[in-house]
Amino acid sequence: MEHSKLIQERAAKAFQVKEEDVKVLNRMLGGMSHLTYHIEIKGIEYTFRIIGKDGNLFVDRKTELKNLEIIKDLGLNNETVYFDVETGEKAAKFVPGVVLTTVDFHPHLKDVSDTLKKLHHSSLKPASDYGLIERLDLYETYTNIRSDKYLELKNNWIKLYNEEHKNMPKVFCHNDAQRSNMVIGENQIYLLDWEYAGWNEFYYDIASFGNVQFEDALELLDVYLGRKASLNEQNSVKFYRMFQALQWHQVALRKEMVGLSEVLHFDFKMLADKYLNLADRLYNEIKG
């Protein structure tokens, strides 16, 4: 079944309308694995998400829904109007705007910083901790692939975590604050896709911003702090980007295992290797 027809069918069921009442407008920019489409039903525009293959392995949908309810009053997200915790299918009010990946982000760094600070400085408590080490352990069970290089880097990361970060304060983090999850609206930047939200050190969200090019995260860090970051602060961002590289290494390996490279015409094995090399590079930079 073609994607637009599938979206039409699922959205009609979710909104309890006829399929012909669902107008499929276009696919949204963003993640490769999920299907997220811009649709219209009886004159109202929405986004509708269908989870891709294995997508629910990596996310607890009940926790995602709880966090969406918790952050609702902050006004950072588009309004969720339908959520199925079993399938992960979700509908939300459509927010007109420009995805940050499609424009030069530099003029918007202050707005990005303010958006993250609004979340980090809120008194809100997320539904769960991000569970860094436990998350890596879980993701490994989906691949059973732990190369010597991966295990060495993971152990080095855990050692650094226990020595320098384990007891640092945590805040409500989005945990996937990359530019593809940010939309420049008329009066604000919207932070979308809260699948991974939870307690974490604020540096984690800064690190996520460097998913295309790591140095972008260091630019955001200076704006966030309102001054030039110290070497230790820069290394904290590198530390969490190193974790993210190890995490996405395992996710990419899983996608390769289940045949998504062929389905999506993208080399996830190459991506997994790229993430592992990034983790190695960042660790060497931290150690100087």
Where are these regions (language model features)?
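Active-site activation/catalytic loop segments of kinase-like enzymes and analogous catalytic loops
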Residues: 203-232, 242-261, 273-278
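Glycine-rich, phosphate-binding/catalytic loops in enzymes
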Residues: 64-65, 108, 189-190, 207-209
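Amphipathic, Lys/Arg-enriched alpha-helical patches that create a basic surface
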Residues: 269-288
